[in-house]
Amino acid sequence: MAAPALGPARGCGAELTLVLLLSLFLLLGWAAGGEEAGPEAGAPSLVGSCGCGNPQRPGAQGSSAAAHRYSREANAPGSVPGGRPSPPTKMVPIPAGVFTMGTDDPQIKQDGEAPARRVAIDAFYMDAYEVSNAEFEKFVNSTGYLTEAEKFGDSFVFEGMLSEQVKSDIQQAVAAAPWWLPVKGANWRHPEGPDSTVLHRPDHPVLHVSWNDAVAYCTWAGKRLPTEAEWEYSCRGGLQNRLFPWGNKLQPKGQHYANIWQGEFPVTNTGEDGFRGTAPVDAFPPNGYGLYNIVGNAWEWTSDWWTVHHSAEETINPKGPPSGKDRVKKGGSYMCHKSYCYRYRCAARSQNTPDSSASNLGFRCAADHLPTTG
């Protein structure tokens, strides 16, 4: 497929421009701490799903243990940690059960977080970790697969992760989110453009994978993408009506439990959780079902088509609408901050076109039974 014409909007509605300007003027400096009950009274409303990670290609249809400590230099270009073990890979059983999906207190109403509804889920298996660069490389080496970012010749990268040399060659940005830049040569092997590499981070989540790429990998591995309901049920880790996989406090006992943005978005990420970009797939404590980084770090694709209209009636193993334009992604990423992209909650959700990719978008797989391969 030919490289897309990179228009200024890239799928984020033009109506967000005024909201963005107002938000950037007012939101910088918000602090997220203590009990997380949503944005403070009188604060500007959060913008829509273009938020922290929704650039699109044009024309496309638990645990109480202390958080793991990793060096801030782990994500620095050229850093090659010595003695780091191979990236972990395993699936964990998710028991059958009934849970409350969504919320009656939506923090981003236009995302369709409401209403709260009872959902029954059959038992299944879920990857304990996001698919890593090393695991995705095995797939590519085995099949010769080319990702859509490689076929298009470009992908979206957060400006703060780019070198000055790469930025100097870019003339366009996403109008409603100018920190997203279309970068030629950006793909899963070169997440921050052609002068970057994943050789020093085999255990970090693979990025710049489209929904179609994720499906191809999961199929090869004898797995599938989780439904949105399965993903959210797994995210909650056996807890009911909690914001995060571990409870309602963002930092229990002052510890970081997810890789998200600290500081002023999009100006400065202080990296207080140990990372300014992605973290290893086994960083931070797992939730009650044994899932690591189920929120933060990298957005994760689900199998569902996007809709913001949900029935309040109880359902069994819902799979979303039969067709649509966008696919659902969950979990937020290292770019999420409460002031702008408060989507590192289990009930939060966003969407993107199936062929879109970005430097904060990855996935993990699910399966009805343990596969014989992968």
Curated annotation (Swiss-Prot):
This is Formylglycine-generating enzyme. Keywords: Calcium, Copper, Disulfide bond, Endoplasmic reticulum, Glycoprotein, Metal-binding, Oxidoreductase, Signal. One of its GO terms (cellular component) is endoplasmic reticulum lumen. The gene is SUMF1. Pathway: Protein modification; sulfatase oxidation. Cu(2+) binds at residues 336, 341. It is found in: Endoplasmic reticulum lumen. Glycans are attached at residue 141. Its main location: endoplasmic reticulum. Oxidase that catalyzes the conversion of cysteine to 3-oxoalanine on target proteins, using molecular oxygen and an unidentified reducing agent. 3-oxoalanine modification, which is also named formylglycine (fGly), occurs in the maturation of arylsulfatases and some alkaline phosphatases that use the hydrated form of 3-oxoalanine as a catalytic nucleophile. Known substrates include GALNS, ARSA, STS and ARSE. Ca(2+) 1 binds at residues 259-260, 273, 275. Its EC number is 1.8.3.7. Belongs to the sulfatase-modifying factor family. It catalyses: L-cysteinyl-[sulfatase] + 2 a thiol + O2 = an organic disulfide + 3-oxo-L-alanyl-[sulfatase] + hydrogen sulfide + H2O + H(+). One of its GO terms (biological process) is post-translational protein modification. It comes from Bos taurus. N-glycosylated. Contains high-mannose-type oligosaccharides.
